[in-house]
Amino acid sequence: MQGSTRRAGAMTDVHRRFLQLLMTHGVLEEWEVRRLQNHCYQVHDRNATVDKLEDFINNINSVLESLYIEIKKGVTEDDGRPIYALVNLATTSVSKMATDFAENELDLFRKALELIVDSETGFASSTNILNLVDQLKGKKMRKKEAEQVLQKFVQSKWLIEKEGEFTLHGRAILEMEQFIRESYPDSVKMCNICHGLLIQGQSCETCGIRMHLPCVAKYFQSIPEPHCPHCNDYWPHDIPEVYNPEKEREAGISKSSRKSLRTRQH
């Protein structure tokens, strides 16, 4: 049986299909990755014991290592949901996106990226991004076209849009962290807890240190009176909840149940 004889560092059809589908999606949440893994076993090796996800991905990564590619795990900056993306370790710049976008579209992304990294909030307004359209390299782009390109970035999970403002998707942070650190050394912000790149989060009003929202949630989880971990001054911000996959799953089941109930009622 294929599942019982495979060795570490060897890819089976299960691994290959998983990798191919992950490449198609670009980035997936952890629950989607687990579902994808199970699907691949069902298609290619249904009698095998499903590997632990961490072992399964480590096995693929050991093969991809020589190609400077890696399946990397991260979390969303707003609520700490685990995500996985296929990251090109050799090409960390915006040029990684070149196969999907034209030169002027990539330049628009660079402009948006710079505004986002430079901002205090980690967001750039669509107005500010569109005002830079005249400075783009390559073919001229109208503002209407630029709006459509920004939506392409959202659909491709490079950007997130919230109420007319844009920030980086977790995919962009996973793939471009090193590039961003090197390209914007004077603007880049780091989390005081995990020491990772920080685009959006909370900051201490006294000493200025910053923390990701999920890091804030975990750090202050059992502390009734939150104080800055650096200067010990009072932390004035609302403390978000720690991400709970079980709670989200229950909410999703409840939501789908209500939806099916409404369907039956009509």
From Swiss-Prot:
This is Non-structural maintenance of chromosomes element 1 homolog. InterPro entries: C1-like_sf (IPR046349), Nse1 (IPR011513), Nse1_RING_C4HC3-type (IPR014857), PE/DAG-bd (IPR002219), WH-like_DNA-bd_sf (IPR036388), Znf_RING/FYVE/PHD (IPR013083). GO terms for biological process: DNA damage response; DNA recombination; DNA repair. Residues 256-266 have a biased composition (Basic residues). Residues 1-102 are annotated as: Interaction with NSMCE3. Belongs to the NSE1 family. One of its GO terms (molecular function) is zinc ion binding. A zinc finger (RING-type) spans 191-232. Pfam families: SMC_Nse1, zf-RING-like. The gene is Nsmce1.
